[in-house]
């Protein structure tokens, strides 16, 4: 039992905000963030450059830009407070930085949900060599 508890604590520490973001994405799309949105287009996944390939990829571009405007905490590791109320994502807590990170994730998850019809499997594992002419935020 103690080993299970230690593993759970370690997983929470490692996943942090990325787990929360993935949970938001699943709630809004019914898709796995890891399987569907990591390494999609030019912006979904680690890093990002080039021109967004479709509306789904643009959600990731806007999310990257939003993270770039967050000051005072690491967006990918920060653990924030949020809930789901009547189908909506509600960010909570008093820390302005954590709320900003939550809002970035909330807006992106909603964007994915609103653009499910643009998701195109041809952009999954899209070669980064095709991502040129980077747009500005």
From Swiss-Prot:
Protein's UniProt keywords contain Calcium: yes
A Pfam entry, by short name: Phospholip_A2_1
Chief location: secreted
Cellular location(s): Secreted
Signal peptide residue numbers: 1-16
GO BP annotations listed: arachidonate secretion; lipid catabolic process; phospholipid metabolic process
SMART domains, alphabetized: PA2c (SM00085)
Active site: 63, 105
PROSITE patterns xref list: PA2_ASP, PA2_HIS
This enzyme's EC code(s): 3.1.1.4
Ligand binding (Ca(2+)): 43, 45, 47, 64
UniProt cross-references to CDD domains, sorted A to Z: PLA2c
Swiss-Prot/TrEMBL keywords: Calcium, Disulfide bond, Hydrolase, Lipid degradation, Lipid metabolism, Metal-binding, Secreted, Signal
Catalytic activity: a 1,2-diacyl-sn-glycero-3-phosphocholine + H2O = a 1-acyl-sn-glycero-3-phosphocholine + a fatty acid + H(+)
Co-factor: note: Binds 1 Ca(2+) ion.
Cystine crosslinks: 42-131, 44-60, 59-111, 65-137, 66-104, 73-97, 91-102
One GO CC term on file: extracellular region
Listed cofactors: Ca(2+)
InterPro entries, A to Z: PLipase_A2, PLipase_A2_Asp_AS, PLipase_A2_dom, PLipase_A2_dom_sf, PLipase_A2_His_AS
GO molecular function: calcium ion binding; calcium-dependent phospholipase A2 activity; phospholipid binding
Family affiliation: Belongs to the phospholipase A2 family. Group II subfamily. D49 sub-subfamily.
Function: Snake venom phospholipase A2 (PLA2) that has enzymatic activity but is non-toxic. Displays low binding affinity and enzymatic activity on phosphatidylserine-containing vesicles and HEK-293 plasma membranes, in contrast to ammodytoxins that have high activity on these phospholipids. PLA2 catalyzes the calcium-dependent hydrolysis of the 2-acyl groups in 3-sn-phosphoglycerides.
Name of the protein described by the UniProt record: Neutral phospholipase A2 ammodytin I2
Organism encoding this protein: Vipera ammodytes ammodytes
Lineage: Eukaryota, Metazoa, Chordata, Craniata, Vertebrata
